[in-house]
Amino acid sequence: MKPGATGESDLAEVLPQHKFDSKSLEAYLNQHLSGFGAEREATLTIAQYRAGKSNPTFYLQKGFQTYVLRKKPPGSLLPKAHQIDREFKVQKALFSIGFPVPKPILYCSDTSVIGTEFYIMEHVQGRIFRDLTIPGVSPAERSALYVAIVETLAQLHSLNIQSLQLEGYGIGAGYCKRQVSTWTKQYQAAAHQDIPAMQQLSEWLMKNLPDNDNEENLIHGDFRLDNIIFHPKECRVIAVLDWELSTIGHPLSDLAHFSLFYFWPRTVPMINQGSYSEENSGIPSMEELISIYCRCRGINSSLPNWNFFLALSYFKMAGIAQGVYSRYLLGNNSSEDSFLFANIVQPLAETGLQLSKRTFSTVLPQIDTAGQLFVQTRKGQEVLIKVKHFMKQHILPAEKEVTEFYVQNENSVDKWGKPLVIDKLKEMAKAEGLWNLFLPAVSGLSQVDYALIAEETGKCFFAPDVFNCQAPDTGNMEILHLYGSEEQKKQWLEPLLQGNITSCFCMTEPDVASSDATNIECSIQREEDSYVINGKKWWSSGAGNPKCKIAIVLGRTQNTSLSRHKQHSMILVPMNTPGVEIIRPLSVFGYTDNFHGGHFEIHFNQVRVPATNLILGEGRGFEISQGRLGPGRIHHCMRTVGLAERALQIMCERATQRIAFKKKLYAHEVVAHWIAESRIAIEKIRLLTLKAAHSMDTLGSAGAKKEIAMIKVAAPRAVSKIVDWAIQVCGGAGVSQDYPLANMYAITRVLRLADGPDEVHLSAIATMELRDQAKRLTAKI
């Protein structure tokens, strides 16, 4: 039953085989349903819900009064099926104690009224999701919705049968044995062909009944996503529907039934349920849901018979599918797709058999969070573990090979390309789900989660690229995700997310002080249905990559009537557009930074692109920049923390290996102090950066402005000093190609200029601090 779904798409005209005497119904309700006849002039309208046809369900409206009617289906029925009197009884009991169900109003056993028994309940308005992926909501909301479902199930299973006055609602102990027996008989009565897997599964279930087959709880029997109505705006369950299969039995049967989608065979469509994939961000793992359920019920999360309940659930689903097809053959099933059920009985039974042979650990792995001020999400913890393992097993061992490729191709046409090992590593990372981790809407990770991952990837110069988390692509993908049109996303964001192309960002200019972004002179002028771009850019990172296909350009769409912060816009410029001229690569302390596609000077000479390439709108450039730079600065700073950890490791290794003046280097007090100061500095900037990430998670970019500015100053300064000490400890080797320290120093020193020089951030911090102090002073006065 699906009452309460918003919109008219869930309703249709009453099917011919389900039509009944509406006048007879109206006369009965006028007599027996209080308030129904209050609006005498109003006409009774009846529509049928497209879903919920096992027991046909109808939407009734008379004036301002709305109700839901549920009845038995017509025709020959399987024994003990479609007992709507039980539905009414259990809903009445649950409603009386405040459990979320539609209010049951009236039950009619007189079959002369509309041809079968029926009952009336209230119409509940809310959200019903039929797709397991719950599209259209954020990963955080999707996760919260799933948690709410499991908490509601735990609440149901915690109810006392006696207090509900439902003694006798079920037979008692031995539920699992009865289920195997009942569904075996139901299947055999409806079978249209011999399916050995059903017989084998039935026999296995009967031989492997759980020892505790004496639990007696109220269970739903068909607990799934589309039997839930959520609050229109909140992640809260306001009604559980379809109590046709409810009884007294073992609670784990409900939990297993809800968990079916984790193992659903790929060859079988989940009719009206969408499709589940481990990549569906925000959907908790099965172990997480079990942990929540068990915690709510106060029971141990180790479930020794979990494979039995999963196998039983698939056995029941196969039996139900066979019953649906049987009714189709008899002409009693109104569902348009009921004929499809003939082909899914066997794969469901085979899946049940496979699960019967598996052993499950339903307990979540314990991850030590002691001492963490900024706690990760469970998914963040799991991904971080996988990233650390991937770094250790695959990325760091490839560092020498990647470095040698660029040394050998320094003067070659291939110097802007990537060694083959990078493509192999990318394929491996994508296969393990370690892809696009920086984008919360795609990865389902928080800023704190990704900050700690960024620290790990900062330990190797090419690691971010392996996970498709390399600047400037990350910032450009964030721009397109947050501000791009659907057309822009399809054309550019999707291939960027797949890693098929790369991009560059063109903001800084050689002829103006770009630390004041309002100085930007590159012009973007509207001409009919196009924009024409003219200007010079430099430090356009990534432009030398052969896969770089698109640039995001910041320029002036001047309107003197607007403030100076609303005179700039961002526009998409394909790199092969006539007039785009790549002038030269710029070196950084002598490095051309080949791996990252270099840093280029680019000229735009009468470059014409469609007006649809403008992002968000004219004058929105700085607004977009702030959205782009906030997360990017956190990523940069946490990568420098990882870089600092690597530099400190090198420093300590060298200090323990080398002897000078008859003692190890670490025994010299100055070196020991460098080591100590390095550890102190790393811990300080890590905490400050994690605080900024936490502020972004909780307050957004605007609320984290001060913290982001502080880390942008503190992290590069501190890490530059740490790398400098490491170089000093390593001596001449520290500035050679035998160590990554010289490159590390170049990277960290540049960060004191990139994304705004220290002095600009310091001025901003001072302004914000003075404003905050003034507010406190005013409050005291």
Curated annotation (Swiss-Prot):
GO terms for biological process: fatty acid beta-oxidation using acyl-CoA dehydrogenase. The modification N6-acetyllysine is found at residue 177. The modification Phosphotyrosine is found at residue 325. Pathway: Lipid metabolism; fatty acid beta-oxidation. It is found in: Peroxisome; Mitochondrion membrane. It holds the Pfam family Acyl-CoA_dh_N. FAD binds at residues 505-515, 539-541, 658, 728-732, 757-759. The modification N6-succinyllysine is found at residue 392. It comes from the Eukaryota. GO terms for molecular function: flavin adenine dinucleotide binding; long-chain fatty acyl-CoA dehydrogenase activity; medium-chain fatty acyl-CoA dehydrogenase activity; very-long-chain fatty acyl-CoA dehydrogenase activity. Belongs to the acyl-CoA dehydrogenase family. Acyl-CoA dehydrogenase, that exhibits maximal activity towards saturated C22-CoA. Probably participates in beta-oxydation and energy production but could also play a role in the metabolism of specific fatty acids to control fatty acids composition of cellular lipids in brain. Homodimer. This is Acyl-CoA dehydrogenase family member 11.
